[in-house]
Amino acid sequence: WDYIGSPTNVIMVISTSLMLFAGRFGLAPSANR
């Protein structure tokens, strides 16, 4: 869990997960369209 220790990595992981969830649920216009 060393790579999740820094706040920047946490923000990156959260933003990436949000992008993936948005793409799956169709909330991101650029993901499905």
Swiss-Prot record:
It is found in: Plastid, Chloroplast thylakoid membrane. Coiled coil: none annotated. Its main location: plastid. GO terms for biological process: photosynthesis. The keyword Plastid applies. It comes from the Eukaryota. It is a multi-pass membrane protein. This is Photosystem I reaction center subunit psaK, chloroplastic. It comes from Cucumis sativus.
